Amino acid sequence: TLDRSSAASDVYKRQELLADPKERSEHIMLVDLARNDLSRVCRPESVEVVSLMDIKRFSHIMHICSTVTGQVDPHMTAFDVFTSAFPAGTLSGAPKPRAIEIIDELEPADRGIYGGTVGYFDFSGNLDMAIAIRTAFIRDHEASVQAGAGIVLDSVPASEWQETRNKAEASVEAVQIAAQLRQL
């Protein structure tokens, strides 16, 4: 993940992101984790990476994105798929069970909905879920924004800190604008 500042810098930053060995290895690890999660509930021959390492641009940041799909095994339910895929490896890390234990040990505050899912199961056996990130939560007139970065062997702490700031920026800005509008 990198910040965005101008169209001209986007071209350079796209190349930088795709050429960065740390970003590439982290992303490939997450793609492999997604393939593994889906292979537990899908027909094995159907699990495939349909797009690999595309760049997606958002208002304040750009990400490397990939898409992994599979045909759900007829003996599996939407709930089976959900429990296999979530919490998402992009928010936990790998190996997932140990990564979740480490998060519980090290993070000073409970994540709450952050990193969880928002979505639905329907009566036809479908589900549609989104990961609850890039969000602001308001309780008792106090807003909180959470963000994080993936830590791997090649991580540079200052870069990971900047990544969390870049990720949180749009949500913080939205809260600030809402507060200004409320005062009008």
Question: Each predicted region: which residue ranges?
Answer:
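Extended alpha-helical targeting/anchoring segments
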Residues: 6-184
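Short, well-ordered junction/capping motifs at the entry into regular secondary structure
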Residues: 1-2
